[in-house]
């Protein structure tokens, strides 16, 4: 959350877009409680949060113990070895993210993103040992 606020502060045009989205959702009664329907309508705010977690993942790397031998680029890595996966590096891979060093929340609103490999964006890890608090 802190990185999202920081990035929105750096990019006032994105901050204004979030404000317009919230103004539209709460235009009839700005003092009311937030509902689940309201949260579902906050598409741009969600994209801003996801993009912040892409650039600054809450879990920068994860470790996994191999349960079987695997071969990568002709090298066999034996069962029992702990492999470390850099989520920070994965999220900045140009193969999956155009201009990976830039804060572009809109990338999460496109079909291009939804058609990407499911494990190219894993801010809370992935698989059976992922974070139970992810959204």
Map each language-model feature to its residues.
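Amphipathic, well-packed alpha-helical segments that form the structural scaffold of globular domains
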Residues: 2, 19, 23, 49-57
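Conserved cytochrome P450 K-helix E-x-x-R motif and the immediately C-terminal K′/meander segment
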Residues: 33-75
């Amino acid at each position: 959350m802190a990185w999202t606020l920081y990035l929105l502060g750096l990019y006032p045009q994105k901050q204004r877009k979030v404000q317009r989205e919230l103004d539209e959702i709460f235009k009839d009664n700005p003092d009311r409680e937030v509902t689940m329907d309201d949260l579902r309508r906050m598409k741009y705010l969600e994209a801003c949060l996801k993009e912040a977690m892409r650039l600054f993942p809450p879990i920068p790397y994860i470790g996994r113990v191999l349960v079987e031998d695997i071969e990568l680029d002709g090298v066999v890595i034996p069962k029992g070895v702990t492999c470390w996966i850099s989520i920070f590096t994965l999220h900045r891979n140009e193969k999956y993210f155009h201009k990976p060093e830039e804060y572009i929340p809109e990338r999460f609103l496109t079909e291009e993103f939804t058609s990407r490999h499911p494990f190219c964006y894993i801010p809370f890890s992935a698989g059976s040992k992922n974070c139970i608090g992810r959204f």
